Design a protein with these regions (language model features):
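Phosphate/oxyanion-binding loops and surfaces in catalytic or ligand/nucleic-acid-binding neighborhoods
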Residues: 6, 32-40, 160, 164
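Conserved short submotifs of the Hanks-type protein kinase catalytic core
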Residues: 2-9
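Active-site acidic catalytic loop and adjacent metal/ATP-binding pocket
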Residues: 95-150
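Active-site-adjacent loop/helix micro-motif of nuclease/hydrolase catalytic cores
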Residues: 10-14, 147-150
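Aromatic-acidic/polar surface patches that form glycan- and anion
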Residues: 22, 26, 107, 111-112, ...
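Active-site activation/catalytic loop segments of kinase-like enzymes and analogous catalytic loops
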Residues: 135-136, 142-208
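Elongated alpha-helical scaffolds
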Residues: 1-2, 157
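Conserved kinase catalytic-core helix
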Residues: 11-78, 83-84, 90-106, 200, ...
Length: 208
């Protein structure tokens, strides 16, 4: 790909352009993925891949969390407090990780080739192009997801816009005292506006 001096990450683009321009780019990204990637490669869910996902992705990651030295003590609490708000701890949420329920849920998912890591930081924008359909490209695909559903791409995008992933990665420090976790987390109004726009698009796209 030819280097473009006008290319910037979507995070920077969001915070230096009107919200409507960022929303137009994300609508274009989602539309292009749907038309050029998801639909042409659509296929039924694979029960073996679902089983592999549950074992290698979900259970293995939960085990890593449970066994991590820095998290071991936190695991023992029924509830944890994050920035002054109480949450049920992971061990109290076992129903969310029930294999039988998740097999049924995942079997109904659309499955196709996906990007696999569609966070804000992996979308690059061209500031010298006005047409939103030609003003972006995506980088760093992740093909190791096993159960490849477009919902994973949508979830990664919401990890950014709803979860504030990029802001969280800029947090300088975090304190942990017993079951209390505290850190400074900022979030921009531009992210809030774009989150609502993307949710509207996904509701229309998924029929919700």
């Amino acid at each position: 790909m030819t280097y473009s001096g006008s290319a910037v990450g979507l995070f920077r683009y969001i915070h230096s352009n009107p919200p409507g321009k960022s929303a137009a780019i994300l609508r274009s990204v989602l539309r292009a993925l749907d038309e050029q990637l998801y639909r042409p490669t659509a296929r039924p869910a694979d029960p073996e891949k679902i089983e592999e996902y549950l074992n290698k992705k979900m259970d293995a990651n939960l085990e890593k969390i449970r066994d991590a030295r820095i998290l071991k003590e936190l695991w023992n609490y029924d509830r944890i407090w994050i920035n002054g708000r109480s949450y049920r701890n992971l061990k109290e949420l076992g129903c969310l990780f029930d294999h039988n329920a998740l097999r049924t849920l995942f079997a109904a998912d659309p499955v196709a080739d996906i990007h696999g890591d569609l966070t804000v930081e992996n979308i690059i924008c061209r500031t010298d192009v006005e047409n939103p359909d030609k003003a972006w490209y995506i980088i760093d695909p992740n093909t190791g997801n096993l159960h490849d559903s477009p919902y994973l791409d949508y979830g990664k995008l919401l990890q950014s816009l709803h979860g504030g992933y990029e802001f969280m990665m800029m947090t300088p420090r975090c304190t942990v005292q017993e079951n209390h976790i505290d850190f400074q987390l900022t979030r921009s109004a531009a992210y809030d506006t774009l989150f609502e726009a993307v949710c509207d698009d996904l509701r229309a796209r998924c029929g919700a």
